[in-house]
């Protein structure tokens, strides 16, 4: 691939992770960035990720960013319209304009209104974190993750192919999709689940007068409500920009819950088992749908002694051998899971390397 210059309007978790992944895989890539967070820009320069940074999106910055081969819009979605209007007059005809928002139809409408259809390929990496900011950016964030691309009908095939190549470089799997279909799919598998997770946590909170539910909440409850720790502001914006799709699916979900309630009241075991079995079969098929580790969690469970420094020692053993940890935590309720310490890795090779290494250090390990 030819040497590229990539621009970023916004260098937070997603923008920063894309920039880091590009720089790690293609050190010759030139990266230019704008962000209002001075510390993020300083950190990016210290880590030698960026060559040029701007704290203001003035004409000088807009002209430089508009001349890039690819310009990533990674600022908050609410800023996209203003940023696009600032960039428009400086945008090179060869520049690919892309975003990372999880709702695509609104920005496609703005692109159409501004006459930028020949430049725009919508983007949505299906990967993220509850954490925010460049300080939490990770070059492995998109490893084996789906990355939706929603090109306009007017953008050239050459630009689409280049964008697919870049997505592959950062370790993700590009999927081409119509923007409206994308928004319905993500409403079902991402946006509605967040609404449900927030609602379920609020339900428990409202009914937990003595704090006992909170005390024992772990395992399954934490797994299905983990996403309720995501940014409330970000999810407010997402829900308000994909309202029609979310409410349509929410109505269907309410109907599903009503059917379950009716079956419970009627002690209708057949309906319950049919529903549970159908859901289990569909859920169990997720891991094998693509023959890829995309949907698989790379988890290791192990026992550690209950003494000061035990967890830190485990993490240090892995870090000294360049094995990155995606998530780590003590399992206080392990009714359906073996091991007291749960470690999640970014990919299967890392998990396998950790199993070998920790086994050599006499840990009792369970791999999931």
Predicted regions and their residues:
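Rossmann-like NAD(P)(H) cofactor-binding subdomain of soluble oxidoreductases
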Residues: 83-134
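NAD(P)+-binding Rossmann beta1-loop-alpha1 motif at the extreme N-terminus of oxidoreductases
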Residues: 1-56, 61-65
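Interdomain hinge/lid region at the active-site interface
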Residues: 210-279
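Active-site capping/gating segments
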Residues: 119-156
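Rossmann-like NAD(P)-binding element
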Residues: 58-91, 95-96
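A conserved regulatory-domain signal marking ACT and ACT-like small-molecule sensing domains
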Residues: 282-368
